[in-house]
Each structure stands twice: as C-alpha cells, then as structure tokens.
Amino acid sequence: MKCDKVLPSAEKGGISMAVYIGLITIGAAMTIETFLRHALLRRWYDLFLALPVWLGWFLAATALYFLLLYLLSLTVDKTKPVQKKSSFYRWLLNETAWLILRLGRIRIECTGLEKLQGLPPFLLVANHRSNFDPFIAIVACPRSGLAYIAKPEIFDIPITGSVVHKCFFLSIDREDNRKALGTILRAAALLRDGTVSIGVYPEGTRSKMGELLPFRNGAFQIAKRAGAPIVIAKTTGTEQIAHRFARRRTVVRFDILDVLSADTVAKMTTREFGEYARAQMLQSEPATSTKKEAITV
C-alpha cells in the first residue's frame, strides 16, 4: 500500500504549498532570464548574479508565507475555549507541518498506518524525543485530526500557539493537579464526542538521551473515560532533526505498534496500559518490519 493512497493532499503540500512553489518558480524564471541575458552578452563572470537573484526570491517567498500566517494568528483569542471544529485551521496546521518538514529535508518512513483505517477517534500514545514529534504524527496521520496535550509554553510561540489552539490542542499544568485533571477531563470529552483524536506523551517530557523514560499513567484515563481505542506508536530519529535541519536530509520512523480496542481499554487499568505500551515500545524493532511506507516531504 502506497502512502499516496492513504494520505490526503495535505501530505503533498496542498494549496498553500502550490502558492509557495509558484513564487519559487517565478524566482527561477528570473534567474534563467538573468543567466541568458548575460550569456548573450558574453560576460561569463556576471552569470554569478543569477544565484543571488534566486536566493533572494526564495527567502522573500518564505518570509511572506510566514508573515501571512503571523498576521492571521493575531486574530485568534487564545483565552477563549474553542467550541467547534475549524476546517480551515486544521488544514492550515497540516499544511504548515508539511512545509516545515519539507524545508527541513525530513523523510518519514512509516509502518502500520493501515491499522488506522476505519478507526474512530483514538488516544495516540508515543515516545517523545524531539519537539518535531507532533509534526511527524500530524503529517503521517492527517485524517486523524490529532490534537495534543502540550506544555503551556507551546501556546506562547508566535503562529504555532494560535493555530494549535484553534485545533483543540490543550495546555496542561503539571504543577497543579486540579488543573491537570481538568485538562484530562476536557480531552476525554473531546474524544468521547468524536471531535478530535488526542495525542499524549506519557513520559511527560522529551528524552534527551534517547532512552524511554518512566510513564505517567494518568494520561491513559483519557481513553478509559471516553470509551475510545488506544493507538501505540513509536517515533525514531527525530532527535537528529534539530542539528541537521535543512542542511542534511534526516530520515525518521513512525511506527504504529498496536491498537487496543475500546472494549479492551475498558477491561484494563491505567497501570496495565502503561506497562503494556512501554513493553511494546521497548520490544519493537522497526528494522524487521515487513511493511514499510515512505512519506517523502
């Protein structure tokens, strides 16, 4: 099964990427014109002017794209809870995630995506190795409508904070148990109503050394309260993105390890969830997978 049969246009860039590429194409045309004009004049040393022309246009197109996103984000009031889905902001999130990975020269190799076909909204549980992890899952599973439970600082990031707020991402205060419980209940309600699928990192923070950190099993309460299935996934290689971004291609893996049905979830305790999910992540060996799907961005 090819990824282009599984993923919608957001994975391939869609409309915003078409506009972006259109601007780059204009820059390329200007570069060619400069090249030919100076070639006809036989001033070979002036041909080097073509590169700055194209580079300047590329940077201008990129800056314009993100400037428009920034201006749009200023219209979002992040103090008000989101009441209904926004197809526009979901589309924008998928497109921007794709563009960021494209600019970063990141290639995603996936296994197990076929397990998500026909699945109702679910709780996605995965390991956490990089700030790019949510982007990987969003691009790999654009039809799932993922919304993550994230630390409050994420919502202070320009553009990002506004877009994810409109897509039902939730802030969690780990220092205040009462507020944290409120976030868990809100996530369970969204999942139960079928509004979004919820993504969590039970480690609670990024693993800086690559090892799997102890789980905080409270996050599994979301699936139990919502009566929803749990999807166990593993991300590999994202810790390399930050120091290679745009300079070198980075290949990362996103593997769907197992899916626990809602009936199975109802019979297990949160501790059992944690132990099982952790064991799956530790025992998984992506290199032995027989069905691999590549998403080139």
Segments (PLM) and residue ranges:
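Generic preference for hydrophobic
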Residues: 110, 124, 148, 254-256
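Thr-Gly-centered strand-to-loop micro-motif
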Residues: 111, 149-151, 173-174, 202, ...
